[in-house]
């Protein structure tokens, strides 16, 4: 999973910061019953090693998309193989330009996976139909509406644009 070894203290610090990045060194130190100097040093080292890249926010429910869908796009294989790479790049950039598209990834040579969010189910499906399914030379578009999130509910709040 990760190539940088972490000990129990590093993991405990990361767990607390992941839950609330606003915690002060003193608060972390009190919760872990470790000296502030130790916690400060460890956080600094985690940043230097790239384990902590940045501190950010997760948007709350009032501003998150209410409906989500995974969209799997399969691109038609062109006669000239080089065109497939260019077209995949075009489609991923096009998708990335929409604020409703929260996440875009290539899967293999011909598939793209996107997480799309919307205010309600009708608007979400309309957006997908008008803006994604209309992209030329797609072999197929599979829309998988998400009915219930079992783990990672905050991801849409992290990915959503303001």
Swiss-Prot record:
The answer to keyword DNA-binding applying to this record is yes
InterPro entries in the record, alphabetically?
A: ArsR-like_HTH, AsnC-type_HTH_dom, HTH-Siroheme_Decarb, PF0864-like_C, Tscrpt_reg_AsnC-like, WH-like_DNA-bd_sf, WH_DNA-bd_sf
- Source organism's superkingdom? Archaea
Which UniProt keywords are present, listed alphabetically? DNA-binding, Transcription, Transcription regulation
* Residue ranges of DNA binding: 25-44
Xref: SUPFAM superfamilies: Winged helix' DNA-binding domain
Keyword Methyltransferase carried by entry? no
A molecular function annotated in GO for this UniProt entry is:
sequence-specific DNA binding
SMART domains (UniProt xref): HTH_ASNC
List each copy of the HTH asnC-type domain by range: 6-99
Q: Name one Pfam family in it.
A: HTH_24
Tell me which PANTHER family the record gives.
HTH-TYPE TRANSCRIPTIONAL REGULATOR PTR2, TRANSCRIPTIONAL REGULATOR, ASNC FAMILY
Protein name in UniProt: Uncharacterized HTH-type transcriptional regulator PH1013
Q: Whose protein is this, by species?
A: Pyrococcus horikoshii (strain ATCC 700860 / DSM 12428 / JCM 9974 / NBRC 100139 / OT-3)
């Amino acid at each position: 999973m990760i190539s940088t070894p972490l000990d129990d203290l590093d993991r405990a610090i990361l767990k607390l910061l992941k839950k609330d990045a606003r915690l002060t060194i003193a608060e972390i130190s009190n919760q872990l019953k470790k000296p502030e100097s130790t916690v400060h040093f460890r956080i600094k080292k985690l940043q230097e090693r790239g384990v902590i890249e940045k501190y950010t926010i997760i948007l709350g429910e009032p501003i998150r998309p209410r409906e989500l869908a995974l969209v799997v796009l399969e691109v038609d294989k062109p006669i000239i193989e080089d065109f497939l790479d260019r077209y995949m790049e075009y489609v991923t950039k096009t998708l990335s330009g929409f604020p409703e598209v929260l996440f875009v990834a290539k899967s293999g040579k011909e598939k793209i996976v996107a997480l799309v969010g919307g205010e309600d189910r009708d608007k979400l499906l309309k957006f997908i139909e008008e803006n994604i399914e209309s992209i030329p030379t797609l072999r197929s578009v599979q829309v998988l509406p998400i009915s219930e999130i079992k783990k990672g509910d905050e991801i849409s709040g992290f990915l959503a644009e303001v």
